[in-house]
Amino acid sequence: MIKIAVCGAAGRMGQRIIVAAVEAGCIISGALERPGHPQIGQDAGLIAGCGQLGVAISDDLNAVVEGCDVLIDFTTPKISLKNLEVCGLKKKSIVIGSTGFTPEERALAAELAKDIPAVLAPNMSVGVNVCFKMLKDLAKTLGDDFDVEIVELHHNKKKDSPSGTAVRMGEVVAEALGRDYNQVANYHREGICGERTKEEIGMQTVRGGDIVGEHTVYFIGMGERIEISHRAMSRDMFSRGSVRAAKWIVGKQPGLYDMQDVLGLK
């Protein structure tokens, strides 16, 4: 059985990952939290609500990584890159679901993953990744005759904007249309800003309440509109996806993979 360690184990996402891993028949070998966290030393299973596992939450990154086959990390880019570096040194696989990576940070992640297999994906949902494939095909079919706008909604605690999933959706569409996403993405419209350019991809964000995550991509033509939407009802789809990725990554060749690789959509 695969031994999985979870970073951010006492958080909402970390708890759901622990539950999903146990349900999938994996072994929870380690549970990591930041130094000084009030739940360090407590049983990770009891914190997650799935019963005692005999695994105490720890702040010792090296020890936690040493004891696992795969580390699952939903934290921040800075923490994830540090964890990726340690996993590389110890030849352990890692699954990263953190969002908010800059292009430079993604490039660094690829460099750090030269010697180990790693999955880096802004969204672990099977449905969202099917949407990525649909968006690519649809953009190629529609071409430049349709304007593209993206709207994403999340809870009021989310720290990054726009979401990593929304950005990836924009990147997929831009790549399919032969555009540079960083050049055509429009995150801000206010006042007299002129007509919309044909190439731009608009990005709008909404933050409020407890919305887990909603994304809609609009392809807007003359007299017609196509919408591709995904709505997350709970975080469990992300946790199950991360465990699926962890089981898939073991034994793979070194390199940086994404959920399209995990799901065989490439």
UniProtKB/Swiss-Prot annotation:
Its EC number is 1.17.1.8. Coiled coil: none annotated. It catalyses: (S)-2,3,4,5-tetrahydrodipicolinate + NAD(+) + H2O = (2S,4S)-4-hydroxy-2,3,4,5-tetrahydrodipicolinate + NADH + H(+); (S)-2,3,4,5-tetrahydrodipicolinate + NADP(+) + H2O = (2S,4S)-4-hydroxy-2,3,4,5-tetrahydrodipicolinate + NADPH + H(+). Keywords: Amino-acid biosynthesis, Cytoplasm, Diaminopimelate biosynthesis, Lysine biosynthesis, NAD, NADP, Oxidoreductase. Pathway: Amino-acid biosynthesis; L-lysine biosynthesis via DAP pathway; (S)-tetrahydrodipicolinate from L-aspartate: step 4/4. InterPro entries: DapB_C (IPR022663), DapB_N (IPR000846), DapB_N_CS (IPR022664), DHDPR_bac (IPR023940), NAD(P)-bd_dom_sf (IPR036291). NADP(+) binds at residue 34. One of its GO terms (biological process) is diaminopimelate biosynthetic process. Catalyzes the conversion of 4-hydroxy-tetrahydrodipicolinate (HTPA) to tetrahydrodipicolinate. This is 4-hydroxy-tetrahydrodipicolinate reductase. It comes from Trichlorobacter lovleyi (strain ATCC BAA-1151 / DSM 17278 / SZ). The gene is dapB.
